[in-house]
Amino acid sequence: MNAEPKEQDSPAPSAERTEASQEISAAGAQADKPKTEANGDGTANGASANGQKPNPKDPSRPRRKKARRACFACQRAHLTCGDERPCQRCIKRGLQDACHDGVRKKAKYLHDAPDGALMPGIGGTFYNNPMRNSLPLSRNGANAVNATGQQSAGANFYPTPQSTTYVYQENTINQGSFPSQSPVSPTFNLKATPTARTNSLSSVNPQPPSTSVSGPPGQGQNPFAGPFFDPSDPALFNFDLSSMNFENRYGALEFGMLGHMATGAGDSPSDSATQRGSMGRSGSAQYASTPITGAPGFGESPGNQQPFMFGDPLLNEWPSGQAPGQPHLPGVYPQSGQGSAIPGHLSKADAPHAFAIESGPASFNSPGATTSPQMTTGLEETPFHSAVASKSNGLAPHGQRPMITTPSLKHQNLQVGVRRRQRNPSAIYDSVKEPYAYTSRFHGLTAFIQRRFPPQKTLQIAKALASIRPSFIATTKTLNRDDLIFMEKCFQRTLWEYEDFINACGTPTIVCRRTGEIAAVGKEFSILTGWKKDVLLGKEPNLNVNTGGSSMPNSGASSRSFTPRSTVDNTPGRPQPVFLAELLDDDSVVQFYEDFARLAFGDSRGSVMTTCKLLKYKTKEDMEGAAAEDSQRWNNHLRKGGIASEAGMNQLGFKDGKVECAYCWTVKRDVFDIPMLIVMNFLPCI
């Protein structure tokens, strides 16, 4: 017996290696027949009769191809595996029944991805499995589909996630068929009656279904144990992941979801979607048969529509234009319960904790966190007093509550007094008929500067204005009358926007034209300087005699002669706004025009931040009534209690008629790139 093997071992070792490689290939081809063939002497194939194995360092030895993913046993042993299942190593060790793909450590951004979605071997069966997408489920549990043992222990080791598309029907309704248009876009044929809509899937004592998919027959699966819908299922959003160049299905799903959210972001919302205010979809679930009463297709009017979102009946609960008399289908969030004090109201525990994401061009209004299926009226659709009345009564007519959006929350939580009349910007385009007379206003500015300032400072201001005069001429020489009228309309429209900003901002703010005329002023600026808004805008005569001279506070006389302007004296019937140069002292005016010459046609986004001295508004009577003891008394008040309230702000600069401030200003240009207005913000230096 020992002599025969020695004689058989006489051939060259290459013959043994060839025989071993053939045996390995044969075993890989018959992976589904796990058995080990042995020679007559009890020695396994692939090894010689004397127990010697092929030399692993032999260059002629066939190399194994590296597997895409090792099995669980080879992964733990850090050994080379193969693509076949069961692999050769598990077959030799007798572990062929437990040979399955190992699970790799997922990246952080994939930690919430199901393991099945990351397995490359089941790319065509995880999402597009016809068994998974076409299993109907009756509520009485009469139809149950049991998977065989070979299917449960075959290619898919991990059970399919609980995202099977179940269609719940009443016992009195026949089971519908499910023809699929595409593997990722099933067409739902649903037939129901109003009676069926009144039954909630989350009502009393729901019977758990008896259908088990890819699992043991005796182990029931509860569809309510998982989430309401599977966000990792591309069929929910009509994704074609096979067309995306991603090795990882979850990465492709994330990319497709971002594209789905961005789809239609710039489109104008449709009438039905705007009124419905619900989440828009491009349609992965369509009604192909008789529609449910009160729930037509997405393109119909929302007056009798019940949106069917994400192909899940449980998410059939969304604000819609449901009529009060129609039966209501409760859904995810119960409307009333044992803990609810008011029927029909969401309890605190049941309310959602986040705003819904608008995934399509359905509406530009933010869905509210307190929205419910019965909230069918938005703030934009009802008068303001009706929303307040609904809040005070607790219940709206027909037991409905108005849909609370972000603007309505702002209005209802704040104590709103008399409502301001809504301004219409269209009136600007109707009222402006003539171009603004910038030439005459520049002449008025020049006359004022010559009348107030000494020759030296007048020359400095003139040089600054002369440096930008060629630019003004070059930009305006091609403009005709229509262009100048359009320029004034642009100015008034921009000023219309700034007025709301000034009223909402607590900083002393003024807006001037490029000539320096005051065009808009905030309340805080009037409190700080004493200049009334009507005086600054030219609606009342300007009786100020404070020019910032050295003899001003005590004597009441100016350092030079100055005749106060009034709208009647100069140009009868025409408003004469105050120039910015009348609000600043001499040095501040010179500094302003030097900075304006650099910024007017320079950096369009530039700004200037520096200090200045604002002149208080004082008439001749104010100057005569001012006494030194009053000034001393006010200074003592500052040392004791400081500045408080509007009266304290108004008394700043009482001593010398000047308020030292830090201010920041910038230049805004029009469509012709010409300086249009100057926006200035002041903060007093206390």
From Swiss-Prot:
One of its GO terms (biological process) is cellular response to starvation. It is found in: Nucleus. GO terms for cellular component: nucleus. Keywords: Activator, DNA-binding, Gluconeogenesis, Metal-binding, Nucleus, Transcription, Transcription regulation, Zinc. GO terms for molecular function: DNA-binding transcription factor activity, RNA polymerase II-specific; RNA polymerase II transcription regulatory region sequence-specific DNA binding; zinc ion binding. It comes from the Eukaryota. Pfam families: PAS_13 (PF24990). Residues 1-64, 177-224, 265-378, 390-422, 544-572 are annotated as: Disordered. Belongs to the ERT1/acuK family. This is Transcription activator of gluconeogenesis acuK. It comes from Aspergillus niger (strain ATCC MYA-4892 / CBS 513.88 / FGSC A1513). The lineage of its organism: Eukaryota, Fungi, Dikarya, Ascomycota, Pezizomycotina. The gene is acuK.
